[in-house]
Amino acid sequence: MGDKDKSCGRGIVILAGGKSERFQSQDKCLSTLNGLPLLQHTIDRVAWVAPNEVIVAARDSEQGEEIRNRITGDFRIVFDYFTDFGPLSGLLAALEHTRCYHCLVIGCDMPFINPEVVEFLFDIIAASRYDAVVPCWDRESGMLEPLHAVYRREPTLSAIKNVIKEGNRRLSNVVAQLDVYLLPVDKIRGIDPDLKTFTNINTPAELELHHH
């Protein structure tokens, strides 16, 4: 990997530090689907879209070591700044350790994420002045996919710091401070008709459902 001072156009940020109570003692990102950890599936599907910068945000050095031992590929590990703080902690750490202008931000549990959809999101933000491109299921109800979205680094970093300073820890509060293009998911169906790209694994039962 290049060092953190090297600028690049695209980066991938994968948030792996969250604890999932529904997975009990298991670490969700290392839970196995069809022979590979969920995190491995996720990295393998998106890394080629931004091969110069893939960052995995882990909750601590213990999890980081486990990831390093079990996951292959060219990626860097950063550690959440705060304990039990939700996705903002890992996202803040990752954005402070990269110089990429635009970053895809995703969870570690998206084994079917579509790299062509990711490419589409990067193309939209590169051709615009928006701070973020966030897929949207329903604008009125605010059903968004903020953990399957592309963000411009600088304004997003500022927004995260503002939100944390206000005592909040929700990613939706960050999105609310940004100039966001809400991309209707129907515009993605031409690439991914069934929108499998948004499938995330929340429970062991869902994991079992996708085994083959």
How would you label these PLM feature ranges?
Residues 2-11, 204-212:
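SAM-dependent methyltransferases
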Residues 3-197:
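Nucleotide and nucleotide-moiety/phosphate-recognizing core
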Residues 188-212:
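Glycine-rich phosphate/pyrophosphate-binding loop and the adjoining helix
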